[in-house]
Design a protein with these regions (language model features):
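Substrate-binding pocket helix/loop in short-chain dehydrogenase/reductase
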Residues: 96-98, 105-107
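Conserved NAD(P)H cofactor-binding loop of Rossmann-fold oxidoreductase domains
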Residues: 89-94
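A short, exposed helix-loop element centered on a Lys and neighboring polar residues
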Residues: 121-122
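Conserved glycine-rich cofactor-binding loop
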Residues: 9, 16-17
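Conserved glycine-rich Rossmann-like NAD(P)H-binding loop of the short-chain dehydrogenase/reductase
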Residues: 30-46
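The beta1-alpha1 cofactor-binding region of Rossmann-like NAD(H)/NADP(H)-dependent oxidoreductases
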Residues: 41, 59-71, 103
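Residue(s) in the substrate-gating loop at a strand-loop-helix junction
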Residues: 141
């Protein structure tokens, strides 16, 4: 079965490398217009060129409300909307036992891995999907199921 996403738009956080980049490339190859976000502009620019199909990018901190707003507004104005939101950006600043993690690392992990996907989803819904429908994909890893 061939995947067709003609006429659809996708916004992929953490889309400049790894799973996010692969998802963005798969969507673009299936005909979707794609925006990727990530922290580093140079990495975003290279990834967008490799993804192809007119992929656009917006560099910024996934947890920054101004970045969220700017990326979503740009996706709507330049690509026509946000039919698919992929919350892929994640961090794991500390891979040791939880009891040894310091509070700033813990807060960063919670902010990036839990608060940011909630905020992106809420903002996309308020700005676009509420009246147009859509799909939200939240990506996670086995790290969310294992303890140390």
């Amino acid at each position: 079965m061939e995947l067709s996403l003609q006429g659809k738009t996708a916004l992929v956080t953490g889309g400049s490398k790894g799973i996010g980049k692969s998802i963005a490339k798969t969507f673009a190859d299936a005909g979707a217009k794609v925006m990727i976000t990530s922290r580093k502009a140079d990495v975003c620019e290279t990834a967008a060129a490799e993804i192809g199909n007119g992929c656009v990018w917006e560099a910024g901190n996934v947890g920054d409300p101004d970045h969220m707003e700017q990326a979503i507004d740009r996706c709507v104005s330049e690509l026509g909307g946000v039919d698919v939101l992929v919350n892929n950006a994640a961090t794991n600043p500390y891979a040791g036992p939880m009891i040894d993690a310091d509070l700033p690392r813990w807060r960063k992990t919670i902010d990036v891995n839990m608060t940011a996907p909630f905020a992106w989803t809420q903002l996309v819904w308020q700005k676009y999907q509420k009246d147009n429908g859509g799909v939200v994909l939240n990506i996670s890893s086995v790290g969310g199921l294992e303890t140390n």
